[in-house]
Amino acid sequence: MSFYNHKEIEPKWQGYWAEHHTFKTGTDASKPKFYALDMFPYPSGAGLHVGHPEGYTATDILSRYKRAQGYNVLHPMGWDAFGLPAEQYAMDTGNDPAEFTAENIANFKRQINALGFSYDWDREVNTTDPNYYKWTQWIFTKLYEKGLAYEAEVPVNWVEELGTAIANEEVLPDGTSERGGYPVVRKPMRQWMLKITAYAERLLNDLDELDWPESIKDMQRNWIGKSTGANVTFKVKGTDKEFTVFTTRPDTLFGATFTVLAPEHELVDAITSTEQAEAVADYKHQASLKSDLARTDLAKEKTGVWTGAYAINPVNGKEIPIWIADYVLASYGTGAVMAVPAHDQRDWEFAKQFDLPIVEVLEGGNVEEAAYTEDGLHVNSDFLDGLNKEDAIAKIVAWLEEKGCGQEKVTYRLRDWLFSRQRYWGEPIPIIHWEDGTSTAVPESELPLVLPVTKDIRPSGTGESPLANLTDWLEVTREDGVKGRRETNTMPQWAGSSWYYLRYIDPHNTEKLADEDLLKQWLPVDIYVGGAEHAVLHLLYARFWHKFLYDLGVVPTKEPFQKLFNQGMILGTSYRDHRGALVATDKVEKRDGSFFHVETGEELEQAPAKMSKSLKNVVNPDDVVEQYGADTLRVYEMFMGPLDASIAWSEEGLEGSRKFLDRVYRLITSKEILAENNGALDKVYNETVKAVTEQIESLKFNTAIAQLMVFVNAANKEDKLYVDYAKGFIQLIAPFAPHLAEELWQTVAETGESISYVAWPTWDESKLVEDEIEIVVQIKGKVRAKLMVAKDLSREELQEIALADEKVKAEIDGKEIVKVIAVPNKLVNIVVK
């Protein structure tokens, strides 16, 4: 057979690996370890798409490579299976979310196995398994005991269509929910919060120790948002009330001409005048309908209402009006700001909108035209006049502290993590609220608190989760007769994914989250591969939980993931009309190399776009595996371009990868394999071993495959193939195309064993040196010949070879040779007359 029969070979080796537990995690303590982690998927009803295997193939290549290098490799897979989609589907169809999830997992697992990934399935985890979420609940009880899990009445992002509140991070810039695109409104509710802010400084500082993309670290730094400045206290005129503002520029206090409170600020109702009460109430209602992102959009029109009250500027005693405006958030800082319109563009626009005073306190701009936001020497600032920014800040902070109306302060943009969901399909929060007003955590001996099975999973309508409908589960009685009620909120999907990488290390332990010695052996994760969309949410939450567990002495490292890599996106093919509107692929026909709209006949422009059901451009890996084979899909996705680049899917590229694998198959099965080395492939083979090794280490898989192609081209020019080079080449291609490699290994090595643990080939540096070199022959200063000669020949040998060359002899025929100048490894210059 002259081609690679993937339909026979791939299932054969997948069966072998499963039967022999080929990829069971090594436990030899004398070996180094390598922990390769994929971001585990949510098992949706749609199954895998071709974007999933890109990251999975990358970690699989590394895992297979490290096994061959003698490492114990931990390469696991599991399921992030709680969450809204399964529950929404169950509500829409009447099906059990547990059954739906189990079916989806089975389908995902089938698809993953068909791609030949070397996962240790003995370590599979599922966040919906009570044996797993027992430990999610255990972590929560520890957070509760340490005061890091607490209840608070907070304004939440309420999504009526989902019947639940969502975290700030789950609200899109347009004010809709990330899940479903539903409207989000602000609503005060009793919620569980996790005090991630207690770890803000450590989460910020420890980023410097991580081998992560700088863009991801910057996103986390910005989300944590450390600011150094001062808290300043403003008294409310004619009352005993006061409020605090945080400012990074206390030196501009003399330019503060009004203050702004968040509409939800606790002082608003108390200080609002009778005349302004109706306007303030209306504005507060309108603000409650907007998300935080919509409220803080810099481009939106400035709105606000005066409360009728005045604050006293502590530095000059001036009375300045107190406004409310929705761009100030109660959840950020103190919920109050001092406005310096001369030097802040948003304040300037607000002042212009409502005809408020603008007082310049930094020289250098024309504050009537726009806010001057650069630095300058202070003016109109009494004892700060003439000072620069740094000196003025130091002086005003000292003054505020001396007068008792302010102090230096460090704040963070980071808010505590909203941890409750009013849904059924999530981990029950293990807390009981007693009728005597106390609350206690469910004892560890009673964990897991199992999610009760019910068909009635619709939201309760009261703002509580459907668990509030389940009286038998809900109501409990203490030994002393005191009645209690279980917490009805469930945990968000982020809970189970915040620590799953730890459970892989010891997935069947019934006594503890994981064994201490095993955690010491495997942590930190050596490489974590997944999408950049998880930069803030999952990665920040996982770091927080890990640091908390470090403080408890559960884990031995400060950070969970030493190296992070974000793969790019695989884009689909799409088509645009003359307006730029996207056209679904089933509305497109190809004629003479161009693309046309089936209905209108308009010629369309082909362009890459994110794969989506609506555009009908989603590529199913099952179809690719059926037609081309799993190895082709793996090689193609790694050869498309750099791993972190976003690149359009190409059927032609897929076919090219398949042709390459067929050439590999023919090379090994058709060439005569020799026990003796004739030296013809010494250089290219050793170059290939070196290049592929180095490029796998640096995740440059596309250039590694390109080098494998170079070797195949060179080897095909030879009649025979040295057996050690054939074996070495098969080992080099094995991480990329493991099924093909296993099959070819049997034909060459004839051991009957898997190639998986055969030692990785090495290269001989001496063979990388060129044996031959090109020299030029000049006659009368003009190049007349180029000759390949052995390296480092003497002058005499070079001269002899040059004069014997037929071209040279023809040029000097009948002429007298005056002089021959030979420069070893460079040229021969012949002077004639």
Curated annotation (Swiss-Prot):
Which residues does UniProt assign to the signal peptide?
A: none
GO MF entries: aminoacyl-tRNA deacylase activity; ATP binding; leucine-tRNA ligase activity
SUPFAM superfamilies referenced in this protein's UniProt entry, alphabetically: Anticodon-binding domain of a subclass of class I aminoacyl-tRNA synthetases, Nucleotidylyl transferase, ValRS/IleRS/LeuRS editing domain
Compartments reported by the entry: Cytoplasm
Predominant subcellular localization, coarse grouping: cytoplasm
Question: Which EC number(s) does the record attach to this protein?
Answer: 6.1.1.4
Superkingdom of this protein's organism: Bacteria
User: Which GO BP terms apply?
Assistant: leucyl-tRNA aminoacylation
Q: Name one GO cellular component term.
A: cytosol
- Positions binding ATP in this chain are 613
**Catalysed reaction per UniProt?**
tRNA(Leu) + L-leucine + ATP = L-leucyl-tRNA(Leu) + AMP + diphosphate
Which keywords accompany this UniProt record? Aminoacyl-tRNA synthetase, ATP-binding, Cytoplasm, Ligase, Nucleotide-binding, Protein biosynthesis
Q: Does the keyword Transcription apply?
A: no
List the ranges annotated as motif 'HIGH' region: 41-52
Record bears the keyword Ligase? yes
User: Membrane-spanning residues where?
Assistant: none
| Motif 'KMSKS' region location, chain numbering | 610-614
Tell me the InterPro entries matching this sequence.
aa-tRNA-synth_I_CS, aa-tRNA-synth_Ia, Leu-tRNA-ligase, Leu_tRNA-synth_edit, M/V/L/I-tRNA-synth_anticd-bd, Methionyl/Leucyl_tRNA_Synth, Rossmann-like_a/b/a_fold, tRNAsynth_Ia_anticodon-bd
PANTHER family on file: LEUCINE--TRNA LIGASE, MITOCHONDRIAL, LEUCYL-TRNA SYNTHETASE
Family as reported in the entry's similarity comment:
Belongs to the class-I aminoacyl-tRNA synthetase family.
Q: What is this protein called?
A: Leucine--tRNA ligase
Gene encoding the protein: leuS
